[in-house]
């Protein structure tokens, strides 16, 4: 059975039940297709990208980070990666995805961006 890593990026502002439903639906889909869902990586976007879409938003990255941790902490195979939220570690989504994909593919997993 081939391992698969699922990748979700987005604002998650705010995170809600349909985000979780989407994750579970994708996990179920790939499990049904015969894959072992090794992990699901959730990556909230940098706040700057949200400011382009919405006007008048307050910067609430700490609040959003707490929401994600509280909402997803019970699920062992869901990993939250905050690197794109943080200006110091933000290398850009395209490079971030490419680096993750190279890492998991080189270790024998299939990497799927949802």
Name what the model sees in each region.
Residues 1-114:
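Nucleotidyltransferase catalytic core that binds NTPs
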């Amino acid at each position: 059975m081939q391992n698969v890593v699922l990748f979700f990026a987005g604002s998650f502002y705010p995170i809600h039940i349909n985000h979780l439903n989407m994750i579970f639906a994708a996990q179920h889909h790939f499990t049904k297709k015969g894959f072992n869902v090794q992990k699901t990586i959730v990556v909230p976007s940098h706040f700057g990208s949200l400011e382009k879409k919405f006007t008048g938003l307050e910067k609430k990255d700490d609040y959003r980070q707490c929401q994600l941790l509280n909402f997803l902490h019970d699920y062992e195979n869901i990993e939250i990666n905050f690197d794109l939220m943080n200006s110091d570690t933000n290398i850009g989504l395209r490079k971030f995805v490419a680096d993750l994909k190279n890492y998991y593919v080189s270790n024998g997993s299939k990497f799927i961006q949802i």
